[in-house]
Every structure is written in structure tokens, then in C-alpha cells.
Amino acid sequence: MTIKLGALDFAAGGLSLEEGVATAEGLERMGINAIEISSGCSETGWAGAWPYAGVSRKRALEDKLFHRIFAKPVPEGHFLEETRRVRERVKCPVIAVGGLRTVETMESVIKGGIADFVSLNRPFVREPDLVRKIERGKRGVVDCTSCNICSGYAGLHGLQCWIKTNKDLLIHAWCRFTGQLH
């Protein structure tokens, strides 16, 4: 059995990293087989890939992601410090997740001992065959731009990547402009 653990809340009075690490140790003692490390909570406004980890402004402009061109960039792999801290204290496999957008970073996370595995979510929405591409030699940045539009429409439209056509991007921009998407 695996568990996804929010190791840090980023909120006043919320879970501290030390408490998160202690929780991971307790889960291991209970017999958990692996722990995926995440952080943040919706109450703080921290919304996963919303900061657009690992995607340059140039790429945002090329992909017509106008709503994020001036967004403050966040380094790729935004939960790696939390993951590293848990990895240091547990023996069960640890899984890194959160804004991993280059094959080289994914490899360095494993080779560097930060985690035993990496977990991806949004990149598979854009590239369902991503693992096969990496096996065949794909290097560099994955096609997912971390725009988070797929997440923003969760429950409103079928799961899809919205960076496929200009029409989809215009629909997204209109929904944001008219307040139909927050």
C-alpha cells in the first residue's frame, strides 16, 4: 500500500515539515510500502502546478498561455526538499512528485538518492505515451507546459490538454475573462 503525504501545509498553524517527516516515520512503522511526498493545501491558495514550474516565459508565449506569461516562475521539482528530508529518515521507498518537467531532473532525483521513484500526473494528460518516449530516448522538457488548465476544468469538461488548438485556448481565455473559471 502506498500513500500520498502532504509533508508541509505552508499555513500558519498547519503541518510543519518536521511533523510531516514524523508522520512519514509513523506510517512506515505501521507497514506502509511507499510514500509519495507532496505539500501545500488548498486553503493557502497553493494549487499544485499553478505556479507553472519549470516552464519559461518564452515557452508560455509560444504556447499562447497569456494568463501566465508574467507569473512568477517556480523552480522545477517544487517538493524535492520535503522529499529529501523524508528520504533521509525512512527506509521504505519514497516517491517524488510536483513539477518534474525534464527527463534529466527525473533521473537526477533517482540517481541522487532524493527519491526511489518519480510520479507524474499532468504530463500524462498531454503525453499519454510519455514513458515509452523516454524509453526510446526522449530528453529535455516534457510537452506539458504546467499551465494547469486541465485541472481548472476538472469536472466541467472531459480530461484533456487544452494546449492542442488555438480554439481551445480561446475558449479557456474567454471562460477566465467572463469569470466562468477561477
Please give the residue ranges for each predicted region.
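Flavin-dependent oxidoreductase catalytic cores
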Residues: 1-182
